[in-house]
Swiss-Prot record:
Pathway: Cofactor biosynthesis; NAD(+) biosynthesis; nicotinate D-ribonucleotide from nicotinate: step 1/1
EC number of the protein: 6.3.4.21
Name this polypeptide is given: Nicotinate phosphoribosyltransferase
Gene: pncB
First-level EC class: ligase
PTM annotation (Phosphohistidine): residues: H224
SUPFAM superfamilies assigned to the protein according to its UniProt record, in alphabetical order: Nicotinate/Quinolinate PRTase C-terminal domain-like, Nicotinate/Quinolinate PRTase N-terminal domain-like
């Protein structure tokens, strides 16, 4: 008999999160332990989530029961850049509901976070996973694990037919699907199948809990929040990206060297990404805009700096599926190293089921607005249109034809 796609507990452990939340959390502990931040949840497609408020609140309370086990700490101790003081702090860490406010406002589910960055940072991924799974339990209660498994094998078959053995040997794919997963059990099953039968190279997962459980490499470096926060932490706004990269370099000394380019725009980022950073960082991550045009821009930048692009890696993570990944791989093969982080299309792709379209983003740091503009107008996020206008002015980013969406 096929098993249900759901289990009682949605978030399995403190490690049931994206690896980059831990890498950023360590940097926050060492550099900004007392900085306050604010975050807001947004359902992008207007779906009515109000009926699920009570269960979401219950699952948030269950989060507060979680703590690191001795086995979890042993796993993290094997990661060379996880420092002893951070692991001691993480061993004491507990989620605290005082920093989370859930309610119904203007007929919409509202989730806000407000508190010290150090104590709020780990909420994002489990909160999104909770909203997604609670909603899916109500809307699709009879979903079976076999449906997700069969769908994944269909994708493997397509890939085997459409890619050559040489291409498959070089096609590097990772699971980046924790935050919008259909359920924990689906993500676990998908990763099991990927590990056993993926015809390309499975290079790891962003989910630390499952990386430990399945003996995979945990993957991730930094998120938009790291660069956004520095808009209010650095001495001048124009220097905020440089301040974010500099702080990262001081923390990790050349490790965890994939930088995210589209917090303002890639053009604005590359203006700050000089020879020093370009040599020190291993590569760049794409998260908005045309992926091949973006890659051409990055390759050209490396070449202008006298750096061989084949010594660098581009990571793609923007709404990917296997056909898109194969197209990008073919366009760039032999010119620069590439890797693909696939999220929703792996962990929430079940026939007849629409995945969640939602975000939980930082809106303020140290009491002042922060923003993400990105390389796509629809991904712009900020509560304060005046700050977005100021950010555009400072970084010489032209106005886009479509209006910015509020965070």
């Amino acid at each position: 008999m096929s098993e249900s796609a759901f289990s009682n507990r949605i978030v399995q452990s403190l490690l049931d999160t994206d690896f980059y939340k831990l890498t950023m959390m360590q940097a926050v502990l060492h550099n900004y332990p007392n900085v306050d931040v604010e975050w807001e949840f947004r359902c992008r497609n207007g779906e009515d989530l109000r009926p699920y408020l009570g269960e979401i609140q219950h699952q948030i309370e269950l989060l507060c029961e979680l703590s690191l086990s001795p086995e979890h700490l042993v796993f993290l101790e094997r990661i060379t850049f996880m420092k002893p003081d951070f692991l001691r702090f993480l061993g004491l860490f507990r989620f605290n509901t005082r920093y989370v406010k859930t309610s119904i406002e203007n007929d919409e589910l509202c989730i806000r976070l407000h508190g010290p960055w150090l104590h709020v940072i780990l909420f994002e991924v489990p909160l999104l996973a909770i909203v997604s799974e609670v909603r899916n339990r109500h809307r699709y209660p009879d979903t079976l694990l076999s449906q997700a498994r069969d769908r994944l094998y269909d994708k493997f078959e397509w890939l085997t037919v459409n890619a050559t053995p040489d291409e498959l040997a070089e096609l590097k794919v990772a699971d980046f699907g924790t935050r919008r997963r259909f359920s924990y059990r689906v993500q676990e099953e998908v990763l099991n199948v990927l590990k056993l039968d993926f015809p390309g190279q499975l290079v790891g997962t962003s989910n630390v809990h499952l990386a430990r459980q399945l003996d995979l490499k945990p993957l991730g470096t930094m998120a938009h929040e790291w660069i956004m926060a520095h808009q209010q932490l650095g001495p001048r706004l124009i220097d905020s990206q440089i301040a974010a990269l500099d702080c990262w370099v001081r923390e990790y000394r050349g490790l965890l060297g994939i930088a995210l380019t589209d917090c303002i725009t890639t053009d604005a980022f590359l203006n700050d990404f000089d020879l020093y950073f370009a040599k020190l960082f291993d590569g760049l991550r794409h998260d908005s805009g045309d992926p091949v045009k973006w890659a051409e821009k990055c390759i050209s930048h490396y070449q202008k700096l006298g750096i061989d692009p084949m010594s660098k890696t581009l990571v793609f993570s923007d709404g990917l599926n296997l056909p898109k990944a194969l197209d990008i791989f073919r366009a760039l093969r032999g010119r620069i190293n590439v890797s693909f982080g696939i999220g929703t299309n792996l962990t929430a792709d079940i026939p007849g089921i629409a995945p969640m379209n939602m975000v939980l983003k930082m809106t303020a740091c140290a009491g002042q607005a922060v923003a993400k503009i990105s390389d796509e107008s629809g991904k712009t996020q900020c509560k304060d249109p005046n700050f977005v206008a100021y950010l555009r002015h400072v970084f010489k980013v032209p106005d886009l034809p479509s209006p910015a969406k509020p965070a």
